[in-house]
Design a protein with these regions (language model features):
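Class I SAM-dependent transferase core
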Residues: 1-71, 75, 108-122
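Short loop/edge segments at beta-strand edges and connector loops
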Residues: 47, 126-128, 198-200
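SAM/dcSAM-binding transferase cores
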Residues: 183-239
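Helix-to-beta-strand junctions that scaffold the AdoMet/dcAdoMet cofactor pocket
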Residues: 92, 164-166
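Conserved SAM/SAH cofactor-binding pocket of Class I
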Residues: 61-151, 157
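Short alpha-helix immediately C-terminal to the canonical SAM-binding loop
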Residues: 106-108, 178, 182
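Short "lid" loop at the C-terminus of a central beta-strand within the Rossmann-like core
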Residues: 130, 175-179, 204
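Conserved beta-strand signature within the Rossmann-like core of class I S-adenosyl-L-methionine
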Residues: 167-177
Length: 239
């Protein structure tokens, strides 16, 4: 392998996490497939290896610093090009992952990736978030739901919390100043059965990239009225 993964390896060490040579090779194959497919399909604006290493791979795996020990099933909602779901599935082969996306051509690409990497712990689902949240196959089925999707916290919570088991967690990857968003989303999170923990703020090592994790505990079942019909959570966020 000609590409240098030392940044990722060293960063993971600072987080007390390790990947085997096989897992690094799986990430490298994923990188190659991502860049190749990106030539004919808009998957990511980040294509330079060093940037992918930091902004996709390290960022996705930064969740290893806070992932609860009791998690066995994970859903990545709005997975897009497979982040954070594919790196997490590589890093955690003993956990079961469901990756959901609304665009079927992205799901088809990710199926190619899953097959090429031999990931037996990944299920791919083509569905809108609102549909998935109302489908009994997925509703309240997961110990942990994660999302790197760009949306306000109220909207993301309406998409994601219906999928979380009572006693489970929703973790949102965020960047930038989120204080106002947090203040505005408190009632929405509570309506959906969640309780927000204190945000976890950090910088990706050796970069000026600041990130935060919003961890929401699922304390009670989400009312049947949520998620609302397709398009409504984004147009009219709960407050």
């Amino acid at each position: 392998m000609s590409r240098d993964y030392s940044y990722l390896i060293n960063t993971l060490k600072t987080w007390n996490f390790e990947l085997s040579d096989k897992q690094i090779n799986q990430l490298d194959t994923f990188y190659e497939m991502l860049i190749e497919k990106n030539k004919v399909m808009n998957l990511t604006a980040i294509t330079e290896f060093d940037e992918v290493l930091v902004k996709h791979f390290a960022d996705s795996l930064s969740i290893c610093t806070i992932i609860p020990d009791d998690v066995k099933s994970v859903c990545d909602l709005g997975t897009g090009a497979g982040f954070p779901g594919i790196p997490m599935a590589i890093a955690y082969p003993d956990l079961q992952f469901t990756l959901i996306d609304s665009l079927n051509k992205r799901i088809k690409f990710l199926q190619e990736v899953v097959d090429a990497l031999g990931l037996t712990n990944v299920t791919l689902v083509h569905a809108r978030a609102e549909e998935a949240g109302r489908n009994k196959l997925y509703r309240e089925q997961y110990d942990l739901v994660v999302s790197r999707a760009v949306a306000n916290i109220s909207t993301l919570s309406e998409y994601c919390l219906p999928l979380v088991k009572v006693g489970g967690y929703f973790i949102s990857f965020k960047s930038g100043d989120i204080e106002d968003e947090i203040k505005q989303s408190g009632k929405a999170i509570s309506k959906l059965g969640g309780k927000l923990q204190k945000p976890v703020l950090f910088n990706l090592p050796d970069t000026n990239i600041s990130r935060s994790f919003l961890v929401i505990d699922k304390e009670k079942s989400t009312p049947k009225a949520y998620p609302r019909k397709a398009g409504t959570p984004s147009k009219e966020p709960l407050n």
